[in-house]
UniProtKB/Swiss-Prot annotation:
It comes from the Bacteria. The gene is clpX. Disulfide bonds: none annotated. This is ATP-dependent Clp protease ATP-binding subunit ClpX. Belongs to the ClpX chaperone family. InterPro entries: AAA+_ATPase, ATP-dep_Clp_protease_ClpX, ATPase_AAA_core, Clp_ATPase_C, Clp_protease_ATP-bd_su_ClpX, ClpX_bact, P-loop_NTPase, Znf_CppX_C4. GO terms for cellular component: HslUV protease complex. Pfam families: AAA_2, ClpB_D2-small, zf-C4_ClpX. It comes from Shewanella piezotolerans (strain WP3 / JCM 13877).
Length: 423
């Protein structure tokens, strides 16, 4: 930087930090005052922090109604109407309870933790994540299969709270308004109906460990992800304010329900499904689930009692998968179209291509979860070549591309110009 000086060659200094014009990149002059670029940046940081502190308080005053929550879910999640309604009411009641922590009549409101039952790829995680994003609250996921009781090899249940804190930069107040989704909860079912002499540290033991956390306790978490140490000060997190959503496929649960209600079908999510009638039967059977069925499946009564809100999700059919590919705000085809648009290229999926992708996902039995990997595979080669290819203005994917019988159709600017001239 050249040695610029003020009037009369006098060296100028920042009126706030005292640094000279040679120690900073820019010095802005005002009436009898100067401010450097570093002080301006510091002021911006302070203002941003203050806005962050104010925003959550403003958000707390504007609790969306169940209708508004449901409408937002409709924008991102296809189908599952009953589950959406159940979730919208439960989430609304949970945050209404936090907002009115001290009811005038002294009635203590219980927690509305949620249990979601449905096959892989039916939208359990997406529902919880979409609500958290809409409500602007921290969200974290945990896999129940990795959890063990404290003192055993594996992940301690309190690590879930640590992950939630990490999502909000260890702001305890924000974390206490967060949502935790615990997946594969059916995998920690009790291994047998009878208590075993051998300790079940990854099944019933984990259920016992999760009980207090889900119901509400003050969890002691090391700050900034440090290891637990006797002399270390812990962050105290009240989990009674955190909404817990547990989800699982519960393969075979319909057989337990059928035994109770004497309905003789007995086909599970894990088994081969042979027809639309069978699929409907499974979904209808799961709608009849009672707490006693979950106990027989392997969840302990105390654990079920901590999850009072129950919602079942149906297996997605071809029509739903096609909708998921193209209709939601963040639909997979829209995401890839946005990527191609960054290369100034239009991406088009023909209707027969969408049907073929849905059929492939059904064959793999991955539900909506497998759609992205299928589309990634279809577009891999073209995404590799496109940045090095000139003049391409449009890429078209049809059924033959999905089946691997041909490559995507490329339309070049010269072709379009020739077509326009011919017309």
């Amino acid at each position: 930087m050249s040695e610029n000086k003020g009037d009369g060659g006098k060296l100028l200094y920042c009126s706030f930090c005292g640094k000279s014009q040679h120690e900073v990149r820019k010095l802005i002059a005002g009436p009898s005052v100067y401010v450097c670029d570093e002080c301006v940046e510091l002021c911006n940081d302070i203002i941003r922090e203050e806005i962050k502190e104010i925003s959550p308080k403003q958000d707390q005053d504007k609790l969306p109604t169940p209708h508004e929550l449901r409408a937002h879910l409709d924008d991102y999640v296809i189908g599952q109407d009953k589950a959406k309604k159940v979730l919208s009411v439960a989430v609304y009641n949970h945050y209404k309870r936090l907002k009115n922590a001290s009811p005038k009549d002294g009635v203590e409101l219980g927690k509305s933790n949620i249990l979601l039952i449905g096959p892989t790829g039916s939208g359990k995680t997406l529902l919880a994540e979409t609500l958290a994003r809409f409500l602007n609250v921290p969200f974290t996921m945990a896999d129940a299969t990795t959890l063990t009781e404290a003192g055993y090899v594996g992940e301690d249940v309190e690590n879930i709270i640590q992950k939630l804190l990490q999502k909000c930069d260890y702001d305890v107040e924000k974390a206490q308004r967060g949502i935790v989704y615990i997946d594969e909860i059916d995998k920690i079912s009790r291994k047998s109906d009878n208590p075993s002499i051998t300790r079940d540290v990854s099944g019933e033991g984990v259920q016992q460990a999760l009980l207090k956390l889900i119901e509400g306790t003050v969890a002691a978490v090391p700050p900034q992800g440090g290891r637990k140490h006797p002399q270390q000060e812990f962050l105290q997190v009240d989990t009674s304010k955190i909404l817990f959503v547990c989800g699982g496929a519960f393969a075979g649960l319909e057989k337990v329900i059928e035994q109770r209600s004497h309905v003789g079908t007995g086909i599970g999510f894990g088994a081969e499904v042979k027809g639309e009638a069978d699929k409907a039967t499974i979904s209808d059977t799961l709608l009849q689930v009672e707490p006693e069925d979950l106990v027989k499946f392997g969840l302990i009564p105390e654990f079920i009692g901590r999850l009072p809100v129950l919602a079942t999700l149906a297996e997605l059919d071809d029509a739903a998968l096609i909708q998921i590919l193209s209709e939601p705000k963040n639909a997979i085809t829209k995401q890839f179209a946005a990527l191609f648009e960054m290369e100034d290229v239009e991406l088009e999926f023909r209707e027969d291509a969408l049907k073929a992708i849905a059929l492939k996902a059904q064959t793999r039995k991955t539900g909506a979860r497998g759609l992205r990997s299928i589309v990634e595979g279809i577009l891999l080669d073209i995404m590799y070549d496109l940045p090095s290819t000139d003049d391409v203005v449009k890429v078209v994917v049809d059924e033959s591309v999905v089946k691997g019988e041909s490559t995507p159709i490329l339309i070049y600017a010269t072709n379009e110009a020739q077509t326009a001239t011919a017309e």
